[in-house]
Amino acid sequence: MKINFQNMYSLRKISCGLIFSMAISLVACGSDNDEEGGGNGDDGLVEDTSIPGNSIVTVKQNRNIILHNPLSGWVLYAGIGDGLSSTFWQDYDNFPSSEGTVKVSDYANTLYLRGAWADFNPEEGKYAWNSDCDTPSAKRLKMLIEGAKQRNMKLAFTFVVDSRDKHYNFTPNFVKEAGAKGYETQTGSVKVWSPYPDDPIFQKYYEKFIRALAKDFNDPDKVQFVSGSGFGKWGEYHSVWYYQVRELGKPELPTREAVFDWVTDLYSQVFDKVPVFVNYHRWIGTSKEWDGNNYDKDTERLIGKAVAKGYSLRHDAFGMKTYYSTWERNFIAKWKYLVPVVMEGGWVKNSHGNSIQGDGYANYAEVRQGEFDEAKTACVNMMDLRYNSDFRNGETYSWFNEAFQLVKQFCTEGSYRLFPDRISLPTTISNGKQIEIAHRWNNFGWGYCPTNIPQWKNKYKVAFALLDTKNDKPKYVFVDGEPEACDWVKGTAKSYTFTTRVEGVGAGKYMWAVGIVDTAKQNEIGIHLAVKNNVTSAGWLKLFEVTAR
């Protein structure tokens, strides 16, 4: 397969697509309600009067197809502690819903593993994902990873170090034994220990763990994202206690900022290929648990520092009106289409029960609707299906039985849904000659495709391929380096003109095709388009036949 990169061979005509748009305005195009990906093919060709030798093909979006694309869709939760069901995959492959039994991985394409650092790192230098570790937690982890692989799901991680509200130590005991400073708290009848995150011994061992993790999991083929902190209560970066503050009485901000800088530097440096996320809420990194509508004046600045390092944003209490309110809404609105957002609901059916009534919810169907509405307003890319060992009382069961229509609605309206509605291509090509391709792109999802984050820099690009007419495999690929999918947002189409030279193409007939390729994987399709008909098994959208001379 020959590859022609725009920055090597092509000449760019920077255009807002005015001529192209005028030419194709005479061609019927799909409306927002189009269901099928048809309309592309030889029968739908119209001569392009603005580009001699070109024909225009129109493409209709498909609103029903569920796309499993990077940083998009539903996230299925799991852990590797004792609470994990031994029939996890069997349960979720045969999951009851309001419309019958479903397979959850048909809807979710990410398995999110949130758990105790101690479970992932039981002894110094020993890690649960390696073959030399055979603890019960390690066996569960390997089972989950293998099951995710079989279902074409990627992984995501959060590692919690704080043991408050837990029934065992979430930080490995060898860290305490090495002399790390910490504090004890009581959970029921159990006394647990948590480290101070400003302690240098803690930081030494934590950094060693994260670097070991990145060595095996800084891989976008395996991992969807990593939460780059995990401090404070529940790993959500609030209610954080510091040694310098709590024991020595020093001001909080200098220590808090130093720890924040250290941990965000660490994750952003070692995970340079996988997106990393930080929580957004009004008390980031403070010792405060909450304080009504008040907020910390340094929080927004600190989160901005993390984003500048390449962090994206998540929040873990969507739908809880105390913890996701005016400050959070206003904050995330400033980052709309600048960084991707991941949501997690806050209400837990099994433990919160009727407390939801304080937020004005009559039942958990209304809770799910409240979470969904907030997620849509925040333009999130990913939503949560949380785990409970008693899954019939869990959030995933609630979504699939009390709000299944919202599960499906997010699949077809949320995240990003990209497709080119109109493309002008030459009907014949000749070696040594320039060709001109005009193309227009849309996004009908409420989120965006974050090709602007540093982990994805120059990774996903629009490409046009000449397919072998016998087997649909690409013989020649022309990569247009100009378009950025992050610019495509709902309600605004983007038009481009791509001029390139044809070199080394064998004479004969080919099929024009278009796709968004992963340049790090020899231009395999990296992002699937929101179309259905005329798509090859590899994900290329076939357009029409072309003759090479």
Place the predicted regions along the sequence by residue.
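Aromatic- and acidic-residue-enriched segments that line the glycan-binding/catalytic groove
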Residues: 164-188, 238-250, 292-299
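Active-site groove signature of glycoside hydrolases
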Residues: 182-247
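Extracellular/luminal regions of secreted and cell-surface proteins that mediate adhesion/ECM remodeling
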Residues: 412-549
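Catalytic cores of secreted or luminal carbohydrate-active enzymes
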Residues: 368-425
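N-terminal secretory signal peptides that target proteins for export/translocation
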Residues: 1-11
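Catalytic-core regions of glycoside hydrolase
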Residues: 48-95, 149, 228-235, 241-391
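Aromatic-lined substrate-binding rim segments of carbohydrate-active enzymes
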Residues: 100-185, 256-275
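Bacterial Sec-dependent N-terminal signal peptides
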Residues: 2-3, 21-55
